[in-house]
């Protein structure tokens, strides 16, 4: 978990921008606020920053972020925070924004489930997919008593699967990634997918097929989990059934179900903002249907949208940049070059240190 050294100050204090959501997009937006010399406050519903990357996939490796050939999810989150932290953004954790009000002077109040009200000149919604919960296998009934001990919906620690017989359900990126990722640690890995081909990234799918060909893993396509067996609250077997009626039984200690998540906008759906399916419609400036209220990341929609981390980081940059004309109306917006800004900050810091040393 990230060590946050700058918790929010008095919630009555005005900030230039309220950022709803502390995932990668929200954190990078805070950095961009610092780059553009505006103050911000991140409000995150979870007990830590990082969104799904920190809460669900901290050990998952990511390969499609510019400049990182390969990076564990939690390391990416920590790197993003290291960038943002230098500008001391306020951070509010464990609070969910339930309502916003646009005042007559054009500023905003955002109210959370705790009753706190936060004030800002503009708002950026970077809440990812909203509230999310894993998709389950309805045919298994209520298996909540096994969740976190034998049945998992995400990999938070590889140690949970070390030396275990693991059955993975799914055919997308997460299922394929962890099929490959757990080979070295698990006693055995069995992948079960109800489709006839994988939907995950081609490179990873090729690695899975190669592992299957050399006998490292077992793969069952066009097959579903029919039922499971347990003994004294511990998983022992997984029963499979194929589309042609064939049946198999696999000895197992862990069932890892990776078939996606159900998202829910929650209070956001009642905010009288233009929606497209389960996302907020934005224009080319990342502005929603309300002036002064922007959206970025997975929660934002426009034609041709790609829901990947890289896109969210770019959208955060655009949203903050374009919010300046609303936050500081009439002021000329100048391009900010990071190398120039950092050099000036470093020079100012050195000058300050020299002055302190001279005074001593």
Curated annotation (Swiss-Prot):
Membrane-spanning ranges: none
Keyword annotations: FAD, Flavoprotein, NADP, Oxidoreductase
Catalytic activity as recorded in UniProt: 2 reduced [2Fe-2S]-[ferredoxin] + NADP(+) + H(+) = 2 oxidized [2Fe-2S]-[ferredoxin] + NADPH
Top enzyme class: oxidoreductase
The enzyme's E.C. designation: 1.18.1.2
Transit peptide is among the record's keywords: no
Family annotation (InterPro entries): FAD/NAD-bd_sf (IPR036188), FAD/NAD-binding_dom (IPR023753), Fd--NADP_Rdtase_type_2 (IPR022890), Ferredoxin-NADP_redctase_2 (IPR050097)
Binding-site list for FAD: 25, 44, 52, 57, 97, 132, 298, 339
GO MF term (any one): flavin adenine dinucleotide binding
Subunit structure: Homodimer.
Alphabetized PANTHER family for the sequence: THIOREDOXIN REDUCTASE 1-RELATED-RELATED (PTHR48105)
Annotated protein name in UniProt: Ferredoxin--NADP reductase
Organism encoding this protein: Chlorobaculum tepidum (strain ATCC 49652 / DSM 12025 / NBRC 103806 / TLS)
Native organism taxonomy: Bacteria, Pseudomonadati, Chlorobiota, Chlorobiia, Chlorobiales
């Amino acid at each position: 978990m990230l060590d946050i050294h700058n918790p929010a100050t008095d919630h009555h204090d005005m900030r230039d921008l309220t950022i709803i959501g502390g995932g990668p997009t929200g954190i990078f937006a805070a950095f961009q606020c610092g780059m553009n010399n505006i103050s911000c406050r991140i409000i995150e519903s979870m007990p830590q920053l990082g969104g799904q990357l920190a809460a669900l996939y901290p050990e998952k490796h990511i390969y499609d972020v510019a400049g990182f050939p390969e990076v564990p999810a939690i390391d990416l989150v920590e790197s993003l925070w290291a960038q943002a932290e230098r500008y001391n953004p306020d951070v509010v954790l464990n609070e969910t924004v339930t309502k916003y009000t646009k005042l007559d002077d054009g500023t905003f109040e955002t109210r959370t489930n705790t009753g706190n009200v936060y004030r800002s000149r503009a708002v950026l919604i970077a809440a990812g997919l909203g509230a999310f919960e894993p998709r389950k296998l309805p045919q298994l009934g209520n298996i909540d008593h096994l969740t976190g001990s034998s049945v998992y919906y995400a990999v938070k620690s590889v140690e949970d699967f070390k030396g275990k017989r693991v059955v993975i359900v799914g055919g997308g990126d997460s299922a394929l990634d962890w099929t490959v990722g757990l080979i070295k640690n698990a006693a055995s890995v069995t992948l079960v997918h109800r489709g006839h081909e994988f939907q995950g990234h081609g490179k990873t799918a090729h690695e899975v097929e190669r592992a299957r060909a050399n006998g490292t893993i077992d793969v069952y396509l066009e097959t579903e989990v029919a039922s499971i067996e347990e003994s004294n609250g511990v998983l022992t077997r997984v029963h499979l059934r194929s589309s042609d009626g064939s049946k198999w039984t696999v000895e197992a200690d862990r069932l890892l179900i990776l078939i996606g998540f159900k998202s829910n906008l929650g209070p956001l759906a009642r905010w009288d903002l233009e929606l497209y399916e389960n996302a907020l419609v934005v224009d080319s400036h990342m502005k929603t249907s309300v002036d002064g209220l922007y959206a970025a990341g997975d929660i934002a929609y426009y034609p041709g949208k790609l829901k990947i981390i890289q896109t969210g980081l770019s959208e955060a940059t655009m949203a903050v940049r374009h919010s300046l004309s609303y936050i500081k109306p009439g002021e000329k917006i100048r391009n900010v070059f990071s190398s120039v800004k950092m050099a000036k900050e470093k020079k100012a810091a050195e000058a300050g240190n020299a002055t302190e040393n001279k005074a001593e």
